[in-house]
């Protein structure tokens, strides 16, 4: 298939592009490089074994997207592009709504004009808000996300659902993922946050290589086994595989298809710290800090629907997530070159 991947040079996008190329698909990457670096592109080509086309541009440029869809005869779109830092979204709500919501509106408007009606959307478990029961199941009503980031993901889900209802021939997959971590097993591709990492695993990795002094563990008085927050961590390679499988199985299958992509088990912050310490062979310096507003004690996915309908399930453990992250970070302590 001929696939447009928006945000394809970012963390999850780049790993997905490698899997698409390895599966024989033709890939066009659209990215404005605000959260990624151009130097990942030759890595994608080398690991994927095939050349992807790269277009530097913004998701909000509808004319550019229309041109790409026509010129490359695109069959399907995998939509990663957007801003993704929860804390930053609270400080910059307008930027988040503009990029994530308006950007998606521009994308699907261009798709409609070009008669491209297969879309895989990178959603998030944040759309569930605070649920009374765990694990989270796709049939749960969506909640009230705490941040503009989470709200933007929910808004886009609602927009795409309304679009498909009005134009039933569309096939739209809403992939709700939990906490992506890990790196390509080659050690040549991984998460390279711009500035201070917002997520746990890359922060631990930077502590391990000496870029950060200590990890702040927010809250050690939660009603969990060790008192720290529990989340569902999924290896980025399993997540990439999930996108490829969803794209291949749902092409031209009309409807809105919602799937949780997660490991289906919860791991605490200290579980992750201990796994990483084992991977790098040294203790990770950490200290406890007060809880953060809006953080939930524990949640994880019920991913049985993706197993049942897509024949997709995770194959990589928390130890492998830590090992692959350490392999990447130790080989590239400063991330990608500029």
Swiss-Prot record:
A GO molecular function term, named singly, is: UDP-glucose 4-epimerase activity
Q: Which residues bind NAD(+)?
A: 11-12, 31-36, 58-59, 80-84, 99, 124, 149, 153, 178
Gene3D superfamilies xref list: NAD(P)-binding Rossmann-like Domain (3.40.50.720), UDP-galactose 4-epimerase, domain 1 (3.90.25.10)
Among the entry's GO cellular component annotations, what is one? Answer: cytosol
Which domain of life, per UniProt? Bacteria
The annotated pathway is: Carbohydrate metabolism; galactose metabolism
Query: Does Coiled coil count among this protein's keywords?
Result: no
Q: Which UniProt keywords apply?
A: Carbohydrate metabolism, Galactose metabolism, Isomerase, NAD
> By its UniProt entry, which CDD domains does this protein fall under?
UDP_G4E_1_SDR_e
- The EC number(s) given in the record are 5.1.3.2
Q: Which cysteines are joined by disulfide bonds?
A: none
**Assembly, per entry:** Homodimer.
Functional note: Involved in the metabolism of galactose. Catalyzes the conversion of UDP-galactose (UDP-Gal) to UDP-glucose (UDP-Glc) through a mechanism involving the transient reduction of NAD.
Q: Which NCBIfam families match?
A: galE, PRK10675.1
PANTHER family the UniProt entry points to:
UDP-GLUCOSE 4-EPIMERASE (PTHR43725:SF47)
**Family the entry assigns:** Belongs to the NAD(P)-dependent epimerase/dehydratase family.
What's the name of the protein? UDP-glucose 4-epimerase
Q: Which organism is this protein's natural source?
A: Salmonella typhi
Source taxonomy lineage? Answer: Bacteria, Pseudomonadati, Pseudomonadota, Gammaproteobacteria, Enterobacterales
């Amino acid at each position: 298939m001929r696939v447009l991947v928006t945000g394809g040079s970012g963390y999850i996008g780049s790993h997905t592009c490698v899997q698409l190329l390895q599966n024989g698909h033709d890939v066009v990457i659209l990215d404005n490089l605000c959260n990624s670096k151009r130097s990942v592109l030759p890595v994608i080509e080398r690991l994927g074994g095939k050349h992807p086309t790269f277009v530097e541009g913004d998701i909000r440029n509808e004319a550019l997207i229309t041109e790409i869809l026509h010129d490359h005869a695109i069959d399907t779109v995998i939509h990663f592009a957007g801003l993704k830092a929860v804390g930053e979204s609270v400080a910059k709500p307008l930027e988040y709504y503009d990029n994530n919501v308006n950007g998606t509106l521009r994308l699907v408007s261009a798709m409609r004009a070009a008669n491209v009606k297969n879309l895989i959307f990178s959603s998030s478990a944040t759309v569930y808000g605070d649920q009374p029961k765990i694990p989270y199941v796709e049939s749960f009503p969506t909640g009230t996300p705490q941040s503009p980031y989470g709200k933007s993901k929910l808004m886009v889900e609602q927009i795409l659902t309304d679009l498909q209802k009005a134009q039933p021939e569309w096939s739209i997959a809403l992939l709700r993922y939990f906490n992506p971590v890990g790196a390509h097993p080659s050690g040549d591709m991984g998460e390279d946050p711009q500035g201070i990492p917002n997520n746990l695993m890359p922060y631990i990795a930077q502590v391990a290589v000496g870029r950060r002094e200590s990890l702040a563990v927010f809250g050690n008085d939660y009603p969990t086994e060790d008192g720290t927050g529990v989340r569902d961590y999924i290896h980025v390679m399993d997540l990439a595989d999930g996108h490829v499988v969803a794209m291949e199985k749902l092409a031209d299958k009309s409807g809105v298809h919602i799937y949780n992509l997660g490991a289906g088990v919860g791991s605490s912050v200290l579980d992750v710290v201990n796994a990483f310490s084992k991977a790098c062979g040294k203790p990770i310096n950490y200290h406890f800090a007060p809880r953060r507003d809006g953080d939930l004690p524990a949640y994880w996915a019920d991913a049985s629907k993706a197993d049942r309908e897509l024949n997709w399930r995770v194959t990589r453990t928390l130890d492998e997530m830590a090992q692959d992250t350490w392999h990447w970070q130790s080989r590239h302590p400063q991330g990608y070159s500029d």
